[in-house]
Amino acid sequence: MPGLLGKKIGMTSVFSAEGKNLPCTVIEVGPCVVTQIKTLEKDGYEAVQLGFQEKKEKHTTQPEMGHFKKAGVAPQRHLAEFKNFETEYKLGDVITVDFLEDAGFVDVVGTSKGKGFQGVVKRHGFGGVGQTTHGQHNRARKPGSIGACSYPAKVFKGMRMGGQMGNERVTVQNLQVIKVMPEHNLLLVKGSVPGAKGSILLIEK
């Protein structure tokens, strides 16, 4: 899907035309620069690689520097590929938030907040084990049994247990576009998006 890179600024709320108070997320979108154009003949598929947020040359590796010099653009901090652009772009072209002006709804891809190692109650919504009386004292938030007896004599794959929670790629689909502010490179979408303030997002049309 065609889209742009952006940065999560934070959340606020706005009033709709009907007077409803809508929670929304403010995203800084672009400007993104075209750093590579992939073609069917050369790469086996068609896509446009976009860069977001310039960085200094001293923070750029030599292979990266060669890539950016070939495109004739300044070093970019974040890169991402998008497919199915209707417009043909050239290396060095700049795409701004105006690109999303006619999009009524967008999909947002980000990395969720990391929660560290969490138990089954927080991670999977378990209710805990039975009563907390009659001598029970240390199993209120335990997972309980994880398998059968001598048969099948193993724990099945996918058994829900405690473990690392969050810090994974999450896609939220069909978020309504509340407002596009080209003068500030800002996009307001209804609801929340994954990640902490300042995290990088992919906004897909």
Curated annotation (Swiss-Prot):
Gene Ontology biological process terms, A to Z: translation
Entry GO MF terms: rRNA binding; structural constituent of ribosome
Keyword Repressor among UniProt keywords: no
GO cellular component: cytosolic large ribosomal subunit
Keyword Ribonucleoprotein in record: yes
PROSITE patterns: RIBOSOMAL_L3
Keywords on record: Ribonucleoprotein, Ribosomal protein, RNA-binding, rRNA-binding
Gene3D superfamilies reported in the protein's UniProt record: 3.30.160.810, Translation factors
Purpose of the protein: One of the primary rRNA binding proteins, it binds directly near the 3'-end of the 23S rRNA, where it nucleates assembly of the 50S subunit.
PANTHER family for the chain: 50S RIBOSOMAL PROTEIN L3 (PTHR11229), LARGE RIBOSOMAL SUBUNIT PROTEIN UL3C (PTHR11229:SF16)
Subunit structure: Part of the 50S ribosomal subunit. Forms a cluster with proteins L14 and L19.
Assigned protein family: Belongs to the universal ribosomal protein uL3 family.
Protein name: Large ribosomal subunit protein uL3
Lineage: Bacteria, Pseudomonadati, Bacteroidota, Bacteroidia, Bacteroidales
